[in-house]
Amino acid sequence: MHDAQIRVAIAGAGGRMGRQLIQAALQMEGVALGAALEREGSSLVGSDAGELAGAGKAGVAVQSSLAAVKDDFDVLIDFTRPEGTLNHLAFCREHGKGMVIGTTGFDDAGKQAIRDAAQDIAIVFAANFSVGVNVLLKLLEKAAKVMGDYTDIEIIEAHHRHKVDAPSGTALAMGEAIAGALNKD
C-alpha cells in the first residue's frame, strides 16, 4: 500500500471556497493540508487554517507569502482573483509546483500566461468544477450546433450579493461553448 500524500496549499483561505477546500483537504484521504494563504495585511494571517474553516485546530498557520511555505506543498489550489492567481502562477512555475485554478475573470493575456505555464507545470484550469455544469456546457454546445444561426441565445444569471465576478466564469464558459459551436468569437 502506498502512503504518499499530496500536500496542498489553499490560496484565499479566508474566502467561502477557501474554507470549504481547507475542510475537504483535512478530511480527504491521500491529501494533506500543507499551507493556507491570505493576502498581505489580512487579519487572518497567523490564525490556524482548520479553526478558520470551522474544522478544529489543524496546526497550519495562515501565511501571506508563498515563499514562506514553498517547501510545504506540491500543488496550489487557487480560487482568488486574477491578479493574485497570476502572481501565484509565476511562483509555482518558477518552483515546479502544480496548480488547480478556479479563479475566473482573466483577460486574454492572463489566459495566455496560464497556457504558457502549462508547458512547464501541471495545471488544472476550469471556470467551474461542478460535474453538472460541465455536462451542461456539452449540452449547450450540441444544442447550439443543432439550432445554428436560426436562433438567438441569451444567458441570464443571478447571484448572491457576495459574488465577486459578474458575469461569472460559468456564464462566460457557457457563452464560449455556444460561440465555439457556432464558430463565432
UniProtKB/Swiss-Prot annotation:
The similarity comment for this entry is: Belongs to the DapB family.
Gene (name only): dapB
GO MF terms, alphabetically ordered? 4-hydroxy-tetrahydrodipicolinate reductase
Q: What's the name of the protein?
A: 4-hydroxy-tetrahydrodipicolinate reductase
Q: How does it assemble?
A: Homotetramer.
Q: Pfam families annotated for this entry?
A: DapB_C (PF05173), DapB_N (PF01113)
In which organism is this protein found? Klebsiella pneumoniae
Q: Name one GO biological process term.
A: lysine biosynthetic process via diaminopimelate
What pathway does this protein act in?
Answer: Amino-acid biosynthesis; L-lysine biosynthesis via DAP pathway; (S)-tetrahydrodipicolinate from L-aspartate: step 4/4
Question: What superkingdom does the record give?
Answer: Bacteria
The EC designation for this entry is 1.17.1.8
Q: Name one GO cellular component term.
A: cytosol
- Fetch the SUPFAM superfamilies from UniProt: NAD(P)-binding Rossmann-fold domains
Residues engaged in binding (S)-2,3,4,5-tetrahydrodipicolinate: H160, G169, T170
Catalysis performed (reactions): (S)-2,3,4,5-tetrahydrodipicolinate + NAD(+) + H2O = (2S,4S)-4-hydroxy-2,3,4,5-tetrahydrodipicolinate + NADH + H(+); (S)-2,3,4,5-tetrahydrodipicolinate + NADP(+) + H2O = (2S,4S)-4-hydroxy-2,3,4,5-tetrahydrodipicolinate + NADPH + H(+)
Q: Where in the cell is it found?
A: Cytoplasm
What Gene3D superfamilies does UniProt report for this protein, alphabetically?
Answer: Dihydrodipicolinate Reductase, domain 2 (3.30.360.10), NAD(P)-binding Rossmann-like Domain (3.40.50.720)
Q: Which keywords, in A-to-Z order, does the entry hold?
A: Amino-acid biosynthesis, Cytoplasm, Diaminopimelate biosynthesis, Lysine biosynthesis, NAD, NADP, Oxidoreductase
